[in-house]
Amino acid sequence: MRYLLDTNALLYVFSAPSELSARAQRIVRGEIDLSVSVVSFWEIAIKQSIGKLHFNMTIPNLESLCLGRNIQILGLGSTAIERIKALPPIHGDPFDRLIIAQAQTEDMTIVTCDKVIPQYPVKTVW
């Protein structure tokens, strides 16, 4: 199975691992196909710049940590971007909508504690 960390799960991995569920901790520690979207890096950078996120790590640092833990970084392709148009307007967060579309396009399971994401036709775990 292929897993895509959403932004909150990514932040927990590197700042508060005890906040991850037991299942999410097993996924992160395991030898599995684990990825993060570049969308999460955009979200973190934007929220840091407007003062909505206090996460004392630069994006290049975060990228290095991900790669050091064999977490692949996925770019966002036009197919996933196009897929957003077909998503129902359940979730108002554009970053989460991009992650949902990417997971659907790549046939991945999203690791998330977000309560709204599972309302979409996408696989999730927490």
For each predicted feature, which ranges?
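Short alpha-helical
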Residues: E19, W42, T79
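Active-site regions of enzymes building and remodeling cell-envelope glycoconjugates
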Residues: P121-W126
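Generic structural signal for small/hydrophobic residues in well-ordered secondary structure
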Residues: T7-N8, I44, I84, A103
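Alpha-helix capping/helix-boundary segments
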Residues: A9-L10, S40, A80, I99, ...
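Active-site neighborhoods of divalent-metal-dependent phosphate/nucleic-acid chemistry enzymes
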Residues: H54-P60, G68-C113
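Phosphate- and divalent-cation-binding pockets in alpha/beta enzyme and binding domains
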Residues: E43, R83-A86, Q119-Y120
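Short, well-structured N-terminal submotif of metal-dependent ribonuclease cores
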Residues: M1-V36, K52-S64, E106, K115-Q119
